[in-house]
Amino acid sequence: MSHNTFGHLFRVTTWGESHGVALGCVIDGCPPGITFTLAEIQSYLDKRRPGQSRYTTQRRELDQVEILSGVIVQDDGATLVTTGTPISLLIRNTDQRSKDYGSIVHQYRPGHADYTYDVKYGIRDFQGGGRASARETAARVAAGALARKIVPGLIVRGALIAIGPHNINRDRWDWLEVENNPFFTPDAEMVPVFSDYIDTVRKNGSSVGALVEIVAENVPAGLGAPIYAKLDQDIASSLMSINAVKGVEIGDGFAAACLTGEENADEMRMGSDGKPVFLSNHAGGILGGISSGQPIVARFAVKPTPSILTSRRSIDVDGNDVNVITKGRHDPCVGIRAVPVGEAMIACAIADHYLRHRGQVGRFER
């Protein structure tokens, strides 16, 4: 299985399976001299970690990150400095229950990658879904924590803005609220609504989809290039690579199709500091594939977890009709834990373009 690497200069290769001994990533192209601590990386992993509420999978993983290469430990024993060589990060699996998947050894779960993996490779890892499991994304979150360190002042924040048919009220958006509830939602009034809805979905043995929004601030103008190296192209690719993501939009996205040219145009004026000021941000911070200096705004849709407890029609590996019921521990709404994953992937895409711009142009916005 190829294509496990993302990026051009800041390259992240993830490895490992959901029910293997461990998983992790190798980061190649990280500049030397970047300082960080394992505690900083761990804080992002803790945000994604399973088993922290009844709204996520009850699989209990500590997700303690270990660093194997590419850094020098400073005198304080905590600060690490990158050397410019490959950085290897490892996260051990400690709570696998492969026996839960015994009933689907020869069956394909509807909506899952079981069938397509088998068609392509002639073999599949039925234990937890292997590389098709959301567990694979833990390593991406670790890489994203380092990516944030490369672009000076970069802030990447995500929020869950819809679960099933329930949407937040954007007038109540509060970034401080995101860290105060298990849904990472910026609308405090939607917390009990989301809670009741997911409780109902879980009791019915089913799952539900979600919508996530990511905002990246302090992104320099000039990142990206026309045609085949557009920043929004790579951001979309990074988000679509996340397991269970089925759609991505930048800025107003599909809503732009309903606007007129006057409504959609991000008009400009010169600010008092001598720098351009945009009067709106319909483009989501990217014009012609190049960052404008405005906040980059992206949203992605996460499908319902296909591993559910209700009976569904499918076939087995011999072509026989079967009814499938999936046992095991699964997220009733995997979109919740996709928030830190989306943050990480956008951070990696921006860091990669930052290094590419620095190498090609050598300067940033005036």
Swiss-Prot record:
Cofactor binding description: Reduced FMN (FMNH(2)).
Pathway: Metabolic intermediate biosynthesis; chorismate biosynthesis; chorismate from D-erythrose 4-phosphate and phosphoenolpyruvate: step 7/7
InterPro entries, per the entry: Chorismate_synth, Chorismate_synth_AroC_sf, Chorismate_synthase_CS
Domain of life of the organism encoding this protein: Bacteria
Binding, FMN: 131-133, 243-244, 288, 303-307, 329
Residues that coordinate or bind NADP(+): 48, 54
UniProt xrefs under Pfam families: Chorismate_synt
GO CC term (a single one): cytosol
Keyword Flavoprotein part of the UniProt annotation: yes
CDD domains assigned to the protein according to its UniProt record, in alphabetical order: Chorismate_synthase
Keyword annotations: Amino-acid biosynthesis, Aromatic amino acid biosynthesis, FAD, Flavoprotein, FMN, Lyase, NADP
Catalysed reactions, semicolon-separated: 5-O-(1-carboxyvinyl)-3-phosphoshikimate = chorismate + phosphate
PROSITE patterns xref list: CHORISMATE_SYNTHASE_1 (PS00787), CHORISMATE_SYNTHASE_2 (PS00788), CHORISMATE_SYNTHASE_3 (PS00789)
NADP keyword on record: yes
Enzyme Commission code(s) on record: 4.2.3.5
BP-aspect Gene Ontology terms: amino acid biosynthetic process; aromatic amino acid family biosynthetic process; chorismate biosynthetic process
Cofactor(s) this protein cannot do without: FMNH2
Family: Belongs to the chorismate synthase family.
Protein role: This reaction introduces a second double bond into the aromatic ring system.
UniProt subunit comment: Homotetramer.
Protein name per Swiss-Prot or TrEMBL: Chorismate synthase
